[in-house]
Curated annotation (Swiss-Prot):
Biological processes per GO annotation: adenine catabolic process
Reactions accelerated catalytically: adenine + H2O + H(+) = hypoxanthine + NH4(+)
Cofactor(s) this protein cannot do without: Mn(2+)
Record keywords: Hydrolase, Manganese
Name of the featured protein: Adenine deaminase
Subunit structure: Homodimer.
Pfam families: Adenine_deam_C, Amidohydro_1
Coiled-coil stretches: none
Xref: NCBIfam families: ade, PRK10027.1
CDD domains: AdeC (cd01295)
Protein's organism: Escherichia coli (strain 55989 / EAEC)
Endpoints of the signal sequence: none
Molecular-function annotations in GO: adenine deaminase activity
Length: 588
């Protein structure tokens, strides 16, 4: 854990210090004073009464001794509780299908003042140009948008076709960027454990920063070895004892509650007064509909308090201070003198009802953010351009031949989890011996002209129709699920025509589709418009059967080979436990 003060992230000049000290001593006028407020004490528990004094971007003082201090402007908190701005410890903004600019507009008014982002989705499609765009967005954002340098592009060498590479030389060019906090999730954990030099070179290059992990279900000597390599955290834990063991071995635990992977209920019982500095909250992947209707990190805090009886100061601690300390962001995470004035005023701390947000010492106005969004997006120079180098397909591209009496592997979906099970089904002249089997195919979209990789999917709930998408972790090829080859082809051709996106087909017609013009991953629409379009897509998808809560997000992980057990990439069926390709037909 990176506990030392990291001056890389703490940009304050001597002149600013002198002004801040003068206000703190009571010798100068503050910019803002927040009156009629109680401050939640994240260290001791309880509350601190008294004003919060702000000069520039920083807090100059806290407490009753500043009751009569002068200020250019006073903010009446009307009895609100003040807490530090919320921090998401690990996410991929691209998975929201929003640009970083739109994401800020949607989440900053909810109290999310800081994000630790790994832009490996767009880097897999566009390479360094994608990372550079995210850095430009971070530089101009009001929200503190920090970047972890994507470490595994592609997620696993030799297992899939992606759009670009991201070499160590390119990674090093970004290491000292002021918004870079470390190395993003090291997904090739077998390679790290076995001591592959190319991976150890990456870890060594970023060892003075924070090294993110990714090791779902890992235990025993393998987990010890992974941690020995220097990995500091994991957001992939999904079992209580798994999380406990990682904490025991010195890992920090990121408790994830996204739109597909929902691990909070399983892991929340671990959080206590003792280990909460080692626990953080993250979303990883959360779509705009859920952000609009349920919230972001604010929704996770609410559930910790209401459903898991986590004490207030502990719930808000893991949502701010714990993460700030872990990433060396020592100017964030507490409402204390000298800290950055990222403040969330809550009219109800138990329900996480946000009344007002300040970031870097300035009040945030949601309407102003919305009004400026288009201009700020244009200023960031988004990397437009069609990234779909694939010709239209026909039903014959998805033809599979099955032999009666033979057994075939089936990717079995677990609703609201990223892991899958590897099962099998026997084929007869009447079809498979289970009625929930549908077809799945992955088509590379980067001009390699490979035939579709085809397989079988169980448990997804698709009774009719087809779903297709270019959001397909991490290489973001085209993934399609369907009950008929004709409808699969129709869905795929729609997303090709759109230049990337999502599509639902039923009754031989496109029922709903969402174009994603930036890298086939993101829309330029507003957050509200996106949420409405996602709502329409989900409604159309529900007509196809009892699908997962977030069918497109769940579908997006069926091609990710670094999460067990059975996945399908553009290269074929992949055993995520043996880390090797396997065959559709069971022969052993």
């Amino acid at each position: 854990m990176n506990n030392s003060i990291n001056h890389k992230f703490h940009h304050i000049s001597r002149a600013e210090y002198q002004e801040l000290l003068a206000v703190s001593r009571g010798d100068a006028v503050a910019d803002y004073i927040i009156d009629n407020v109680s401050i939640l004490d994240l260290i001791n528990g309880g509350e601190i009464s008294g004003p919060i004094v702000i000069k520039g971007r920083y807090i100059a003082g806290v407490g009753a001794e500043y009751a009569d201090a002068p200020a250019l402007q006073r903010i009446d908190a009307r009895g609100a509780t003040a807490v530090p701005g919320f921090i998401d410890a690990h996410l991929h903004i691209e998975s929201s299908m929003m640009t970083p600019v739109t994401f800020e507009t949607a989440t900053l008014p909810r109290g999310l003042t800081t994000v630790i982002c790994d832009p490996h989705e767009i880097v897999n499609v566009m390479g360094e140009a994608g990372f550079a765009w995210f850095a430009r967005c971070a530089e101009q954002a009001r929200q503190n948008q920090y970047l972890q340098v994507s470490s595994c592009v592609p997620a696993l060498e030799g297992c899939d076709v992606n759009g670009a590479s991201f070499t160590l030389e390119q990674m090093l060019a970004w290491r000292d960027h002021p918004q870079v906090t470390g190395l993003a999730e090291m997904m090739d954990y077998p390679g790290v454990i076995s001591g592959q030099n190319a991976l150890l070179d990456k870890l060594d290059a970023f060892r003075h920063l924070t090294l993110d992990g990714h090791c779902p279900g890992l235990g025993g000597k393998e987990l010890n070895a992974y941690i020995t390599a220097g990995i500091e955290n994991c957001h992939e834990s999904y079992q209580l004892e798994e999380g406990r063991r990682k904490l025991q071995l010195g890992m920090s635990l990121m408790i994830r509650e996204g739109s597909a992977a929902r691990n909070l209920n399983a892991l929340a019982p671990l959080i206590n007064e003792f280990n909460s500095p080692q626990c953080m909250l993250c979303t990883d992947d959360r779509n705009p509909w859920e952000i609009a209707h349920e919230g972001h990190i604010d929704a996770l805090i609410r559930r910790l308090i209401e459903q898991h009886n986590v004490p207030l100061h502990v719930a808000y601690r893991v949502a701010s201070w714990s993460t700030a300390r872990h990433f060396g962001l020592n100017h964030l995470g507490l409402l204390a003198p000298g800290k950055q004035a990222d403040i969330v005023l809550l009219s109800d701390a138990r329900k996480v009802t946000v009344q007002q947000v300040l970031v870097k010492g300035e009040p945030i106005d949601a309407q102003t953010l919305q009004a400026e969004e288009s201009a700020r997006l244009a200023q960031s120079a988004p990397p437009y351009g069609n990234t779909i180098a694939r010709q239209p397909v026909s039903a014959s591209d998805f033809a599979l031949q099955f032999t009666p009496g033979k057994r075939y592997r089936v990717i079995d979906v677990i609703h609201n989890e990223l892991i899958t099970h590897s099962h099998s089904s026997v084929y007869s002249e009447n079809g498979f011996d289970r009625d929930d089997v549908s077809f799945i195919a992955v088509l590379e979209r980067y001009g390699q002209r490979l035939a579709p990789a085809c397989g079988l999917l169980g448990g997804f709930g698709l009774n009719e129709g087809a779903l297709a998408a270019t959001v397909s972790h991490d290489s973001h090829n085209i993934v399609v699920i369907g009950r008929s080859a004709e409808e699969m082809a129709l869905a795929v051709n729609q997303v090709i025509q759109d230049g990337g996106g999502l599509c639902v087909v039923r009754n031989g017609q496109v029922q709903s589709h969402l174009p994603l013009p930036i890298a086939g991953l993101m829309s330029t629409d507003t957050a509200q418009s996106l949420a409405e379009q996602i709502d329409a897509l989900k409604a159309a998808a529900r007509e196809c059967g009892p699908l997962p809560d977030e069918p497109f997000i769940q579908m997006a992980f069926l091609s990710l080979p670094v999460i067990p057990a059975l996945k399908l990439t553009s290269q074929g069926l992949f055993d995520g436990e043996k880390f090797a390709f396997t065959t559709l037909e069971v022969t052993e």
